[in-house]
């Protein structure tokens, strides 16, 4: 792979990773420990490897059929997660809130990585480029998720108890933006 071929992949990786960064800002406003932040970032990175790989395997011919559906599903998942965070921060006390682990973490990671499925569909299967592409997508998304989570964690300290509500609203807003781009 030449440098000229790598540049568009790096740009795509950052574009896909910005979803993870944006929603991680909101998720970071939950009371997360550094270990959880590391785990969340790795999970998002893994999903950003798996989803485009699945898309590449299915190939370019499915891109038009599932591109809009994948985009819609990702937006709905983010909106649902955002409402859940707002709901849990209002109705539950600090001790009973669930951390983003288990199924909620997988829903979150799936939601921010579903767009990479569509990108994988459009890229198709290109041998060695497939490996480089999916590893690049995963690494950049993991890195941007960590940055977003850490910034969100810092912002929560400044916002106090309302930080989690703001984080949920950010997720809902981002999901609505995906549904109704300005």
Swiss-Prot record:
The gene is mntP. It is a multi-pass membrane protein. This is Putative manganese efflux pump MntP. Belongs to the MntP (TC 9.B.29) family. One of its GO terms (molecular function) is manganese ion transmembrane transporter activity. GO terms for cellular component: plasma membrane. Keywords: Cell membrane, Ion transport, Manganese, Membrane, Transmembrane, Transmembrane helix, Transport. The chain crosses the membrane at residues 6-26, 37-57, 71-91, 101-121, 131-151, 162-182. It holds the Pfam family Mntp. The lineage of its organism: Bacteria, Bacillati, Bacillota, Bacilli, Bacillales. Its main location: membrane. The keyword Acetylation does not apply. It is found in: Cell membrane. It comes from the Bacteria. The keyword ATP-binding does not apply. Probably functions as a manganese efflux pump.
